[in-house]
Amino acid sequence: MAEAKTHWLGAALSLIPLIFLISGAEAASFQRNQLLQKEPDLRLENVQKFPSPEMIRALEYIENLRQQAHKEESSPDYNPYQGVSVPLQQKENGDESHLPERDSLSEEDWMRIILEALRQAENEPQSAPKENKPYALNSEKNFPMDMSDDYETQQWPERKLKHMQFPPMYEENSRDNPFKRTNEIVEEQYTPQSLATLESVFQELGKLTGPNNQKRERMDEEQKLYTDDEDDIYKANNIAYEDVVGGEDWNPVEEKIESQTQEEVRDSKENIEKNEQINDEMKRSGQLGIQEEDLRKESKDQLSDDVSKVIAYLKRLVNAAGSGRLQNGQNGERATRLFEKPLDSQSIYQLIEISRNLQIPPEDLIEMLKTGEKPNGSVEPERELDLPVDLDDISEADLDHPDLFQNRMLSKSGYPKTPGRAGTEALPDGLSVEDILNLLGMESAANQKTSYFPNPYNQEKVLPRLPYGAGRSRSNQLPKAAWIPHVENRQMAYENLNDKDQELGEYLARMLVKYPEIINSNQVKRVPGQGSSEDDLQEEEQIEQAIKEHLNQGSSQETDKLAPVSKRFPVGPPKNDDTPNRQYWDEDLLMKVLEYLNQEKAEKGREHIAKRAMENM
């Protein structure tokens, strides 16, 4: 009887709140119908506000109420909301023995429960935003004034009232207390049973995924073994087929197609590389052609520069000779010979070569020298000029013998101004500076005249060098006479001519030192002697005869035309009666020197082209 009383008491207590809920639901539905009639747009909004999860929660809540109503074991101070978690745990464990029968409830009870669920579903969307507002941690309203250190002891009465209205399972995901830590909330949500279920789920997932990976690895290994076996079989078949057929491969169609495609790709790559190499070679050849054209242009420009230098040099000689005639008066012939003395046989040979290369007659060339004109650039020479392109590059003997010319000073053209006496030590046997000076038609250093004035008449006109002391003032010096500038200008002209001769002599000396094989020591015969000023006419006739004999070997016309030239530009005086033989030997020596210069020029050109090609590569 006691059990029956407690059962009916629990049912009565559960029906009392249902009655209140039904009355409130009827009132709310009446108001809602009025609102829907007034505002038809609100109907669509309310239709969308019925989510299916809320209905599921309502049904679960109904089932929990039914289980609480039919629960046999209950305490005297029974709270209907304290036993909500017990049926849930029983449901998770799968214990269906304690579930009561569903037929025990009447139809009226079911209708009341459904109406209550509908009322809760209507009121929850409106009250949810008010109730589930997050706590603002910075606001002072949420914090109590007398807050203790242990924030767990703080009680929240408002939240208790709300929990009395709704079971705690509805607010599992919401944060009730803002002062609780996250890990504490998680510990409250996850029970040991839920953790055990999760662990079992993960274990099952591991079991499901593990065999798949193992199966895949096994399949890959089997496939590799299968391919290796197939390769071995193909190799054995190839060997057997080669023995039978005679060298042909036995491959399946797919392998043949793959090999053909690979060969085609390789051939295409090789063709592309060959085409690129051909294009690169064409570009390089084009660059080399451009370089050769540049070298030709440079050689032509250098040729014109050399010709202009020779013409300017000869013009200077002619002007110096003319000025000497005007100043000397009665001694005009000796003055012309004096000015024309630096012109040696090599300059005459250079004039002949220039006339041949430029295809200009000697007479016209002499007239151009007189007037100072240059030949037209349209006339192309048949072969290159015998003069080297760059004398500084050819004179490499200085690099091997740095002490050869110590006291020299380079001029604008690159020739040294003063001859060095240290070169006599580097000369080969049978060759000396005296031989080179004799070859150039000049006198040796021992037999050289003291001054350019052979007679006392010219020496008297030379300004005596007055001593200048540190103690004397410049006002006590003698004033210059009116004729002093003429003498100074004439002396400057002499010095310029002497510098040119010295430069040419040193250049030939370097060439002879570099190529000593052109000299035969058995043919050199030094005969010391000194020409006197009284035998100048006889010396000129002998030189003229020697030049005529040399030029008769080439052509008779040029000798007739150059005879007055040789008279006008005589060479240095001979030393003895063996002048013709010595002159022939000098001419042969000059020809050899010029040949070697041409060879060296060609070698230099080839080296220059090779260097440019290597730089471009």
From Swiss-Prot:
Signal peptide bounds: 1-27
Disulphides: none
Main localisation: secreted
Region annotated Disordered, chain positions: 120-143, 257-302, 552-583
Entry-linked InterPro entries: Chromogranin_CS, Granin, ScgII
PTM statement from Swiss-Prot or TrEMBL: O-glycosylated.
Sulfotyrosine modified-residue sites: 151
Oligomer status and interactors: Interacts with Secretogranin III/SCG3.
PANTHER family: SECRETOGRANIN II, SECRETOGRANIN-2
Protein's name according to its UniProt entry: Secretogranin-2
